[in-house]
Design a protein with these regions (language model features):
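Glycine-rich, phosphate-binding/catalytic loops in enzymes
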Residues: 61-66, 156-158, 186-187, 206
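Generic beta-sheet signal
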Residues: 48, 161-164, 169-171, 190-193, ...
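Active-site core segment of subtilase-fold serine proteases
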Residues: 2-101, 105
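Substrate-binding/access-modulating region of protease and related hydrolase catalytic domains
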Residues: 113-185, 227-230, 234-235, 267-272
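Subtilisin-like peptidase catalytic core
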Residues: 77-147, 250, 264-266
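Active-site/binding-pocket entry motifs
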Residues: 53, 68, 113, 196, ...
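An often Trp-containing, charged/polar helix-loop segment at the C-terminal end
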Residues: 252-274
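Extracellular S/T/G-rich loop segment that most often corresponds to the catalytic His/Ser-adjacent loop
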Residues: 179-248, 252
């Protein structure tokens, strides 16, 4: 990809621009305390995307699959449990990242995007409402909408997720444009911080809270293949993997505490006295 194609939000995570942030005084090293030895067992993860290829060597078994479809004769949407292929490859990429990091997690595919990687905001809302009602532990949203009409319903849903115990991990737009639900305080918003091996970073200035590897990363892709890609979507998958590991090792942590643990594990975290 060219420089012009790279995520604009990444500039927040240039090492020279990172400011130290006060973090919880957790046991050191924080990463070892937070997710060391965890494999994601017992954590239910929903990937809301283009579908996930069941049986891909980097994904393994898809434990459940639903699609959002139109209700005949109206504008309503319904969620139907049904196996489906990945129509693009994007969802498989996210799922493969999560499963590689947390191989024992329970993984669900929630299909809302089509073969052009486009979908309707109403389908996203229906999918999120279902995922919240099903009380998933982690929901990855490497997609968004900029439609102002969807601001309020999405904010309400993300608040329901937050207070109901579901951690929503959302990729910010790849260009400087406000989209939802990544802009809400109730979610964990993520942008690319660089190539593989780039450290987790925390940004004190909104809207992109966390930076994670998302530049020239090799990911699972449709038809059993792989692809080298760049984008905030893939950074969100990485953070969803971390959140899955944290929730497996510390199952009692509510969403706000999970975000605090991530911030404490960031490369620019500064310890404060208790």
């Amino acid at each position: 990809m060219t420089e012009q194609d790279r995520p604009a939000w990444s500039e927040f995570f240039v090492p020279s621009r990172l400011r130290p942030v006060a973090a919880l005084p957790l046991p050191q090293p924080v990463a070892e305390w937070a997710w060391g030895g965890s494999d994601g067992a017992g954590v239910r993860v929903a990937v809301v995307d283009s579908g996930v290829e069941d049986g891909h060597r980097l994904v393994g078994r898809v434990d459940g699959a639903v699609v959002v479809e139109d209700v005949e004769g109206g504008d309503d949407k319904r969620v139907v449990e049904r196996a489906h292929p990945d129509l693009y490859g994007h969802g498989t990429a996210i799922a493969g990242t999560i499963r590689t990091m947390a191989p024992a997690c329970e993984l669900w595919s929630v299909q809302v995007l089509g073969p052009s990687l486009k979908g309707r905001a109403a389908s996203l809302v229906a999918a999120l409402r279902w995922a919240v009602q099903q009380r998933f532990d982690v929901v990855n949203l490497s997609l968004s909408t900029g439609g102002s009409a969807w601001f309020a319903p999405l904010q309400d849903l993300m608040d329901d997720a937050f207070f109901g115990g579901t951690v929503a991990v959302c990729a910010v737009n790849n260009v400087f444009s406000a989209t939802f639900p990544a802009q809400f305080a109730s979610v964990i918003s993520v942008a690319s911080s660089g190539p593989p091996g780039s450290p987790l970073a925390y940004n004190v200035d909104p809207p992109a809270e966390f930076g994670a590897p998302g530049e020239d990363v090799t990911v699972a892709w449709r038809d059993g293949g792989t692809a080298t890609v760049t984008g905030n979507s893939f950074s969100a998958g990485y953070v969803s993997g971390l959140v899955t590991l944290i929730r497996a090792k510390h199952p009692g942590l509510p969403p706000f505490a999970v975000k605090s643990v991530l911030a404490a594990a960031a490369v620019n975290a500064a310890r404060v006295s208790p």
